[in-house]
């Protein structure tokens, strides 16, 4: 795993919500994330290590309150972990590069994959394809 910043360094770099989500497996409140309604063309990166995670053309409105994607940029971009917390059986997704918590993946997405990668905005940064502007969740 590439991210080896200390907890103190990450606390200085990230907002309280970003730290909570990425380092403590937290979840931001639904419909509050800065990147939920972003419709620009570009790439969504890990907020912690900047590794590319999702292309904008795989993003869709699932109605769940968090940015949703049907496919990551590569198999290596995401790490999958069985999650049995909160009395549920889910699959947690983490950054394949730095192990930051991103959200969960569910088998109820659209074709071509049938998967819904439900991702906290607070774990993402977005790079605009046209002008290079960056937005952080």
Curated annotation (Swiss-Prot):
Transferase is among the record's keywords: no
UniProt-listed SUPFAM superfamilies: Mss4-like
Signal peptide start-end: none
Ranges where the MsrB domain occurs: 7-129
Assigned EC number: 1.8.4.12
Keyword Acetylation annotated: no
Molecular functions per Gene Ontology: peptide-methionine (R)-S-oxide reductase activity; zinc ion binding
Binding locations of Zn(2+): 46, 49, 95, 98
Catalytic residues identified in the record: 118 (nucleophile)
GO BP, one annotated term: protein repair
Reaction(s) catalysed by this chain's protein: L-methionyl-[protein] + [thioredoxin]-disulfide + H2O = L-methionyl-(R)-S-oxide-[protein] + [thioredoxin]-dithiol
Cofactor(s) it depends on: Zn(2+)
Cofactor annotation remark: Binds 1 zinc ion per subunit. The zinc ion is important for the structural integrity of the protein.
Keywords per UniProt: Metal-binding, Oxidoreductase, Zinc
Protein name: Peptide methionine sulfoxide reductase MsrB
Species per Swiss-Prot/TrEMBL record: Salmonella arizonae (strain ATCC BAA-731 / CDC346-86 / RSK2980)
């Amino acid at each position: 795993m590439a991210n080896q910043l200390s907890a103190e360094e990450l606390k200085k770099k990230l907002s309280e919500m970003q730290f909570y989500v990425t380092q403590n497996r937290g979840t931001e409140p639904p419909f509050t994330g800065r990147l939920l309604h972003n419709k620009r063309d570009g790439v969504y990166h890990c907020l912690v290590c900047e590794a590319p995670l999702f292309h904008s053309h795989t993003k869709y409105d699932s109605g769940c309150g968090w940015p949703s994607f049907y496919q990551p940029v590569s198999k290596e971009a995401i790490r999958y972990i069985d999650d049995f917390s909160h009395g549920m059986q889910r699959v947690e997704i983490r950054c394949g590069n730095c192990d930051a918590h991103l959200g969960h993946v569910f088998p109820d997405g659209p074709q071509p994959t049938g998967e819904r990668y439900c991702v906290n905005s607070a774990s993402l940064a977005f790079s605009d394809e046209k002008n290079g502007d960056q937005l952080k969740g």
